[in-house]
Amino acid sequence: MPRWEAAALLAAIVGVCVWSDDPGKVISDRYAVYWNRSNPRFHRGDYTVEVSINDYLDIYCPHYEEPLPAERMERYVLYMVNYEGHASCDHRQKGFKRWECNRPDSPSGPLKFSEKFQLFTPFSLGFEFRPGHEYYYISASPLNVVDRPCLKLKVYVRPTNDSLYESPEPIFTSNNSCCSLAVPRAVLVAAPVFWTLLGS
């Protein structure tokens, strides 16, 4: 392969790598939680999901395809609570109602609620999350229903490298250097290969 073709190929590869390494792109994952007492992850009481900022948590409510007596269908009111409310499974401990799973026999399928973990929300009823913090959800059965276990979920928002909220000490989050050079990783990896191809 002639030298100029190798250089052009390498430049194209580096360009694609740099373009795909754009830090401005928002990449998110979705995590599904099936909120019902038959979900084994709820049985020990330590169900935890780890998310990152911009990820989604999808809560799927109980749903029944076959007809069942109403008293056998699971219905829940989900609350976001503080640590004490999670530990005691008491939504009155600084908790607020988040969602209501109240249509287990809906012909259109299970109710699904989604939580987006974001630093800032444009919605007045939205919730803002901070990296490095834990958030807690519990459910309470409707008042006329007894013998329902307490279902609890802990969500941990992973710290990020560019977050200003993950360290209580500002010295660890501020950039004290007078200048910084932001070089994409792909360029640093490809530079030695490029020089090797040119030298051969």
UniProtKB/Swiss-Prot annotation:
It is a lipid-anchor; GPI-anchor. Residues 176-200 form a propeptide. The keyword Lipoprotein applies. Gene3D superfamilies: Cupredoxins - blue copper proteins. Disulfide bonds join 61-101, 89-150. Residues 28-161 form the Ephrin RBD domain. SUPFAM superfamilies: Cupredoxins. GO terms for cellular component: plasma membrane; side of membrane. GO terms for biological process: axon guidance; bone remodeling; ephrin receptor signaling pathway; osteoclast differentiation. Transmembrane segments: none annotated. Pfam families: Ephrin. Residues 1-22 form the signal peptide. Glycans are attached at residues 36, 161, 175. It is found in: Cell membrane. Keywords: Cell membrane, Disulfide bond, Glycoprotein, GPI-anchor, Lipoprotein, Membrane, Signal. Its main location: membrane. CDD domains: Ephrin-A_Ectodomain (cd10425). One of its GO terms (molecular function) is ephrin receptor binding. A lipid is attached at residue 175 (GPI-anchor amidated asparagine). Cell surface GPI-bound ligand for Eph receptors, a family of receptor tyrosine kinases which are crucial for migration, repulsion and adhesion during neuronal, vascular and epithelial development. Binds promiscuously Eph receptors residing on adjacent cells, leading to contact-dependent bidirectional signaling into neighboring cells. The signaling pathway downstream of the receptor is referred to as forward signaling while the signaling pathway downstream of the ephrin ligand is referred to as reverse signaling. Binds to the receptor tyrosine kinases EPHA3, EPHA4 and EPHA5. Interacts with EPHA8; activates EPHA8. This is Ephrin-A2. It comes from Gallus gallus. The gene is EFNA2.
